Every structure is written in structure tokens, then in C-alpha cells.
Amino acid sequence: MKKFALGVGIVALAIFSFLYIQLYRVQSTIDEQLAQQNIAVQSVNLSLFPPALSLKNIKTTQFSVQKLEAKLNFLPLFYGNAKLHSLNLQQITLNQNAQNSANISMDLAPFSLNQLLSQKVMLNGESHIRIEFDKPIYGNKTFNFTFKKANLDFSKSKSALIQFVDASLNNQPLGYIETHADFTSPRQQMVTYIKPQCDNDCLAILKYQQIDNQSAVNFSGKYFPVKRLFALLNLPEVLSGHADFNIDFTFLHSQLIQGKLNILAQNGEILGVNLLDMVSQYFPINYNGDLLQYKELNTRFEQFYLQLFLQQNQLIAEKIELKTPALLGQGKGIIDLHRMECNVDINLHSTDQRYQNLALPINFFGNCSSPQYKINFTKKFRHQLIDAIKEKLR
């Protein structure tokens, strides 16, 4: 029995010795990579139980990280091929002038530890990234990002190429994403192309530029799915269809100080509002069968144009223009981004030439996803309605 216990102890000691030798080799490889790429690190620590790697105060020409923690798979250590499956980065900033930092946690498809500090990293398999910023970006501090494949190329000291396949942000599918980054001091620029799966060719382009404490974002696109666009902008889901859009945001010390949005949605629906049903109660119009079949909970439209600007926690709709097969509309309103409440005034006209002078004023208020409404029966509207009825009876 003593011999058996002694044998087990010797085997266990041999295994642990072998594993620690493997860890020493891993650390030697990491130290070599850090030296080759001129990456400054305060300390590098490896542990066996649980298998993990920790680096403190990492500094490169492109970014800095206060602390990096990587969890390793245990079994691959026996073969001398350390693989990591999760990664945590604390207080990462893109350059010394950056006004915002982030904590990033990643659950990754297992990949070789040798790639962690290499200039080119390729990931294959479902991966999840959670990003939490120190300061909110457009009202959000936390972003959840997933993808199935990724290519990260940092082989050039002042630029980078990042590609994702089957990507999704905050549960919104974005498809293929490609980012070109320029870290030339003192200016920092990034251009990102987003190409989701669409019925027709659709594309969005995100441009970011930072100089000192100021930064600017331009987000534009063609035939982009409206629901995905509104979700990315943290706007209430009130429209469907596809949109051409151009959006400009200006930041100071990472705080959003100015925003302008122009969105032209086409061939979609206003969700949760049936304008045709509302109007049919007041307009002396006979709707044909083709129009009545769409009398459901939504309003089908051909075009919906929004011109908005950001004012503190509100989006001010300077101009709203609507075109449906039966109606034309013009209006303006306010969206409270904290409460997700809307207050919109819109005047509806018939597309019938005989009733162009009749404008039905409607006020929508309350929850943007299921608003209440009231008809503003002004003296002007009453006179217009009487004139329209007289015209119809002639």
C-alpha cells in the first residue's frame, strides 16, 4: 500500500513538474513576443490552479490596458499548446489623449495563447464580447457584441484592420463588419463598413475622428433596415422598411454635445398606429378595397422623412413628412430619450385632389411604441370639413 501511494505521489509530482515547465515555456514565449513588439508591461504572472495569465499596465503605440487576465484551457497545456477561452481587459484606452476608457470581457472560441500578443489574430467560432465604458456613449455604457469569425491585423504600427463575420450588436444582426483604424498622433480616425444581409444591396458607413478632447462621428447608409438602425441609435421601434440616412454627432470629453439626424425611410410601416382608420372617421373619402386590406394595427407608407436634432436628452423633430397611398402628412415633435415618450403633431391630407385643402390635425403623445392620440378640432378644421362635405355633395 505504501509503495502504491509512493508511486501515485511520484506520478503526481512528475505531472505537476511537467505542467510548471510548460507554464515556464509559455511565459518565456510571452516575454519574447513582448520584447519583439516593443510592448511595455509592468508584470507577467502565470498560475496553474486555475490555469490563467495576468499582465499589468500594458502600453503600446495603439492602446494601453491597466490589467489583462486570460483564462486557459487545462488539457492543452499537456501538449505544450496553451489555449485561452476567456479574456478580461480593465481600463483599456486607445491612446494617451482618449477621454473614455472601457472594461472588456470576452468569451471566445478557444485559440492559441501565442496569438494573444501577435500582430495578427484570427478567431473561428461563436464569440461574445461585453464592453462597458466609463462614460456613456449616446446614453449607453454597455454594449454586447457577438460574431462567428474575426480577423484582427495590427501588423502596422500606426494602423489596424479589423473584420467580423456574422456580427451582432445588442441582439441586432449586422452581418459583415470591416474597420480601418489610423492611430497617427495626435489624430485618431476609424472608418467602419457594415453590410448586413438585405433583400437589396445595403451598406452603412461609420466614420470616427478625434483630435485632442473633441471627437466627431458620421454615420450614413443606403437602404439600411430601419428596425436595426433605430435599435443601434437606441430609438423606439416605431418604423419598419429600409432607410437612407445621414447622422452627425459631436462629442467633448466623450460627452455628446450635438447631434443631427436625417432619415428617409421607404416602403415600410408605422408600427402600432393605423392612420387610415383614424382618418376614415373624419375625412369624406371612399377608400377602395386595396387600401382597406391594410387597415390593421400599422400604417403602410411609401416614404417617411425625419429631420431631427439632439437637445440634451431629447430628440427634436424639426420636420416630419409622410407619404402613403391615401395620405400625405407634415408635422413636428419631441422624443424624450430617457422615458421613450413622444409628443408629435402632424397634419394629414388626402391624396385626393378634391380634398387637398382639408388638413386633419392629430397629436400623438405618451409611449412611443403605443401612443395615444387626440384630434385637434380647431375652428379652421371645422370650416375645412364643412367645405369638403359641401364639395362632395355637389
Give each language-model segment a name.
Residues 148-152, 286-287:
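Short, flexible N-terminal segments of the mature chain
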Residues 2-3, 28, 32-35, 100-120, ...:
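N-terminal secretory/membrane-targeting helices
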Residues 52, 56-59, 84-101, 105-110, ...:
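Small-residue helix/turn framework positions
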Residues 27, 31-32, 38, 102, ...:
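Extended beta-solenoid/beta-helix repeat architectures
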Residues 393-394:
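Short, solvent-exposed mixed-charge patches
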Residues 5-19:
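Hydrophobic membrane-insertion alpha-helices, especially the h-region
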Residues 15-98, 362:
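Terminal hydrophobic membrane-targeting helix
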Residues 37, 61, 80, 122-123, ...:
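Extracytoplasmic/secreted proteins and extracellular or luminal domains
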